[in-house]
Amino acid sequence: MKLLALCATGLSLMLSFTSCTNNKHLISDAAERNAVQQDFETRRSKLSHGDLFQVFEQPMSDEQREALTFLYAYMPLGDITDYSGEYYLENIDYSLKAREEMPWGKTIPEREFRHFVLPVRVNNENLDDSRKVFYEELKDRVKGLSLHDAVLEVNHWCHEKVIYTPSDARTSSPLASVKTAYGRCGEESTFTVAALRSVGIPARQVYTPRWAHTDDNHAWVEAWVDGQWYFLGACEPEPVLNLGWFNAPASRGMLMHTKVFGKYQGPEEVMVQTPLYTEINIIGNYAETAKATIKVVDANQQPVPDAASNSKYITTPNSIPLPTKQPMPTVKPS
């Protein structure tokens, strides 16, 4: 009996030690981790009524807790109140599962995984269980493929599920699009981003508010492959990436942008930074770009402080204001 008790104690100690050493950080940089934690605490202090954050009382790994903290720090208020913490925790578990089981999972950098795989929301769709459903259906289909070929294969799968049909209603959820088997470009791209993320592939929805040649807009998808972002037409499979019907008009577009979940610090130009998301300009992925500086002076050729400029481009029959970059706040020296 004493020997058995000793063995059991030793086993208990070994399991405890293993559990501690297996706890990995989702955010390895301590400064970034602390910044997310501070944003989360600020958010939680403003939503102190009720049990909106009760899920954090559950036992979980450091990786799960940091992922949950990241989501709650930056998700829209409605997503906190309308969906349970258990829902987000399950989505996190499937994201981590995909990273562990997909052959490319360990090659995805922390930043791209955090901002372009982990988030559940893509647009203004209702959230659903698509990550779990899509993962179970796609995991064997992309088995043995390279990351590049997996992106192409997922888009083929999306084409089998959804075709283009114009609509004006609120963006349908990924599972709703599968059920109806149709969607406009914003819904097809929401669906395709969700499908790519379900198997651990960083993906984002790209939007141009107006083409240069016509008074219309479009949305499509970019996927991260081996250090580079590639574009694809959602549910419009091609044999290679960076090929779509919109190649030519995109090369003349005045703005291609995407809204990134959280405070994103990537190489792209930041147009707008809010407490919850980062809007970035990615037109450089589609056309050669150059910076132009407009100097506003008075009659004496002196700079006019805080002058507003308004530039437009012409589309028949309209003139459309060009997008502007939000001025970054200046910090006065103390």
Explain the meaning of each model-derived region.
Residues 1-7:
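Bacterial N-terminal signal peptides that target proteins for export
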Residues 17-19:
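C-terminal motif of bacterial Sec signal peptides marking the signal peptidase cleavage site
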Residues 21-30:
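Bacterial Sec signal peptide processing site at the extreme N-terminus
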Residues 28, 37-180, 215-216:
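Secondary-structure boundary elements
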Residues 137-141, 145, 150-156, 165-175, ...:
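Hydrophobic/aromatic-rich core segments of domains that either
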Residues 290-298:
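A short, amphipathic beta-strand motif
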Residues 299-325:
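Short, ordered, surface-exposed loop/turn motifs in non-cytosolic proteins
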Residues 329-334:
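Short Pro-Gly-centered beta-turn/loop motif in secreted/extracellular proteins
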